[in-house]
Amino acid sequence: MLTLKKSMLLLFFLGMVSLSLANSKRADEEGEDKRADEEGEDKRADEEGEDKRADEEGEEKRKRFLGGILNTITGLLG
């Protein structure tokens, strides 16, 4: 009976150690996934910011171009 208790205690201990290691490994992987997601979000935000800036610059160029054309046309007409 004593050897059975020792064996059961040993199995319980080894199972708890294994479970603890598995939980810590899973937590590490989740942390890495969160960091990767955050980095991906940062990159997307940077890309969106660049897109907005490019759109604004394009809009300014169009306004300048149209303004130049209108000035030329009014100069020719009047």
UniProtKB/Swiss-Prot annotation:
Segments of this protein annotated with the region Disordered: 24-60
Subcellular location per the Swiss-Prot or TrEMBL entry: Secreted
Top-rank taxon: Eukaryota
Signal peptide region: 1-22
Cross-referenced InterPro entries: Frog_antimicrobial_propeptide
One cellular component (GO) term of this entry: extracellular region
Positions bearing Leucine amide: L77
Keywords: Amidation, Amphibian defense peptide, Antibiotic, Antimicrobial, Cleavage on pair of basic residues, Fungicide, Secreted, Signal
Entry-linked Pfam families: FSAP_sig_propep
Basic and acidic residues composition bias: residue spans: 25-60
Primary subcellular site in the record, as a coarse category: secreted
Propeptide: 23-64
Expression tissues: Expressed by the skin glands.
Keyword check for Signal: yes
GO biological processes: defense response to bacterium; defense response to fungus; killing of cells of another organism
Family designation: Belongs to the frog skin active peptide (FSAP) family. Brevinin subfamily.
Function: Antimicrobial peptide. Active against the Gram-positive bacterium S.aureus (MIC=30 uM) and the yeast C.albicans (MIC=100 uM). Not effective against the Gram-negative bacterium E.coli at concentrations up to 250 uM. Lacks ability to induce contraction of smooth muscle in isolated guinea pig urinary bladder. Elicits histamine release from rat peritoneal mast cells.
Descriptive protein name: Kassorin-S
Organism annotation: Kassina senegalensis
